[in-house]
Structure formats: structure tokens, C-alpha cells
Amino acid sequence: VADVVLNRVLDTRYPNTICGVVKDGPVKESWKTKQYSSLPDSERIYNPIRHKCQFSWWCDGRSDTAHDTDSWMKAQEIAQRLVQSGKYRGITEGATHYHATYVSPRWAPTLDQVGRIGSHIFYRWN
């Protein structure tokens, strides 16, 4: 999944930062700021629309608070190593899309399948 994010950063069809790629998708203004018409745009709060973003773990509506600190620390270490050292880069052969094996998204047949890792299938543009 991290390799897909990094592949998208390098693809001009997507934002050119990791956070930009992860947060890509429609947003809506929070009720906390929407009620104030005179509030400047820079102070408004926007949230991803649930289940409408590119990466479901960003907009699933669940708390982002880590409850398993050991797993969270390991995930951070892997992400840092991946970004800094390039370890595992290319493992998805340039994939810009993926999905779990238990779903069948309508976009899947329009892309080239490049592989499977665990319970995820990876694709790239033709």
C-alpha cells in the first residue's frame, strides 16, 4: 500500500506529496465552522467525505488514535524506512491502484493487474 502511495506521488494525475495523495478526494466543511458566514477561508475546517476518498483508512470515520502502540510504532518505522531508504520500492511494479481480494471495484477491469500481495491485488494504468 505504501508503494502505491509513493507511485501516485510520482504520477502527474495525483497530488505530488504523500499527504496530498492520501487525503485526495472530496471534502465537506465541518458544522463547527459552516455556521459562521464571516469566518475567513483559512480558519474553516474541512473533513473528508466518508467512504469517498482514495484510501478508505483516511475517510472511514473511525478515530485515528492508535490503540496498539507496538503495531503503530512498527508501522511508523516501516514507513520511515520505505521513504528514506527506498526499501521495498517497486514491489508493486508501478501500481497506482489496489483493492482487497474480497471486493470487486468497477475500475479494476480498466487497469492492468500487476500482482497480488497477501489479500491485496495491485494494478497500474495501461
Where are these regions (language model features)?
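Bacterial extracytoplasmic/cell-wall-associated proteins, especially those involved in peptidoglycan
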Residues: 1-126
